[in-house]
C-alpha cells in the first residue's frame, strides 16, 4: 500500500486552491413565485429599483412597480405566457428607454418603439428614458406663438399656443379624434413635428387614421405610437410616456412638436387594472390613489422651454431658439359627465378644454364645440393679430344666441334688436360648421369672419351660408391671391387689409351667385 506524504497532500491542496476559478457573474437574480394576468411576483432581487427593467428567460422583459419587503411585483412588457414559477429573473440596472429622433417620423411603432408598419427597421441613433422629469419653472417660457388647428371654432374662440396643454373632452362619437387628426393635418406648412399616441383603440380604427395621415401627406412629419386594445395593459400604460419622450427630442433641440394622446381615459383604465392586480388599495371609482400623478407627470412634460435651456441641452449647438411640446390629451366622458374622477383630474391639470357635446353633434353642428364651457387659459396671448382682432365678438354672439334661443321658444313677439341678435347668432353658428379633413388657413378664416363681423351675412339665407363660404373663398384665391398670401405670411391686421377685405366681399356679393 502506497504511503501518502503529508507534505505532498498539503502541496496538492494548495495547488487546487490556486487553480480554483472564483470568478462569478455579479447578477442580482431572483425566482418567479407567481405569474398571473401579466403580473409577476419575484422572490429575491433585493437591489431592484422602482421602474427598473427586469429580464426573464426567453428574452422577455418586465418593469418593477411594487418593491415589497421580501418580493418584487413586476409588470410584463409583452407576452407572459412563456413565464413559469421557478424561472430566474435578473436585474438589468437600466430604466426603460425608447428610440428617439427624426428617423421615427413617418413610422408606426409600438409602445416600446419597435416598428410595426412593415417598412423595415428604424435606425435611430439615440434612445431616451420613457420616464423623465418635466422642465423646471426657470427653464420655461410663456406661451406666445400659435398652433393653428385649422378649425374656425377653435382658432377664434379657444386658441391653442405652442407649449400649451389643451384637453379635448366629450362623449364617444362626438368628433374628438377627428379634431385631433385635423390639427395634425393642419401643421403641414408650420414646421411642427407631430406624435399621435393611440391607446386602447381597435386596430381597424388606428389603420384608418394612419391611412388618412398618409393620404394627406401628414405622416411624413408624424410618428404614430400604437398600444391597441388587444395589447397588454402594461403597454397601454407605457405608450403615452414613450410618445412624450419622442416629442421631447424635438422640444429640447429648439424645435416645435405636437402630441395627441388618444385617449387618456383608456390609459387610466389600464393603470387601474395593473394596480388592482398588484394588490394596491383602490380609491374612488376603484382607481389607485396616484392616478392624478399618472396624468400630471405626463402632461407637465408638455411645455415651452427658453433659449437658455435649449442651448445648455445641445451644448451650445442650437442658440437663440426656444422649443415647445404642445399636448392635446383626449378624455372620453360617459353621458356628458365631466365631474367624474379622471375628467376632473385632467381638466385641473391642463390649460383649458374643448368640450364636444353629443346633442350639438347630432343636430349637425360639427365640430360640436360647446362655446360656453370650452376655454383656453393661455392661448389668447398666442393668437395671431388678425384672428385676435376679428374673433372678439364671436364667442359673445354665440353665447347670447344660445341664451336668447332658449328664451325665444316661449316668447311670441320679439323686439327688433332681439330678432337681429338671433339672426346673427344663427349665421355665426352656421359659419362655425366645418367639414372633416378640411383645415382652413389664417387667411381663409380671416376672410369669412370679417364678412360675418361686418354684417354682410345678414342678407344671405342661413341654409346658403356654407355654399357662400365655399364660393367666396374660391373667388378670393382667384381674384385676391396676393391679399390671401399677405395675410398668411404676416397675420397682421390694419386699415389697408380691412379695406381690401371690405371691397372684396362687397364685389363678390354684387357680382356672384352661389
From Swiss-Prot:
It is a peripheral membrane protein. Its EC number is 7.1.2.2. GO terms for cellular component: plasma membrane; proton-transporting ATP synthase complex. It catalyses: ATP + H2O + 4 H(+)(in) = ADP + phosphate + 5 H(+)(out). ATP binds at residues 170-177. Keywords: ATP synthesis, ATP-binding, Cell inner membrane, Cell membrane, CF(1), Hydrogen ion transport, Ion transport, Membrane, Nucleotide-binding, Translocase, Transport. The keyword Nucleotide-binding applies. The record marks 374 as: Required for activity. The keyword Kinase does not apply. GO terms for molecular function: ADP binding; ATP binding; proton-transporting ATP synthase activity, rotational mechanism. PROSITE patterns: ATPASE_ALPHA_BETA. It holds the Pfam family ATP-synt_ab_N. It is found in: Cell inner membrane. Its main location: membrane. Belongs to the ATPase alpha/beta chains family. Produces ATP from ADP in the presence of a proton gradient across the membrane. The alpha chain is a regulatory subunit. F-type ATPases have 2 components, CF(1) - the catalytic core - and CF(0) - the membrane proton channel. CF(1) has five subunits: alpha(3), beta(3), gamma(1), delta(1), epsilon(1). CF(0) has three main subunits: a(1), b(2) and c(9-12). The alpha and beta chains form an alternating ring which encloses part of the gamma chain. CF(1) is attached to CF(0) by a central stalk formed by the gamma and epsilon chains, while a peripheral stalk is formed by the delta and b chains. This is ATP synthase subunit alpha. It comes from Psychrobacter sp. (strain PRwf-1).
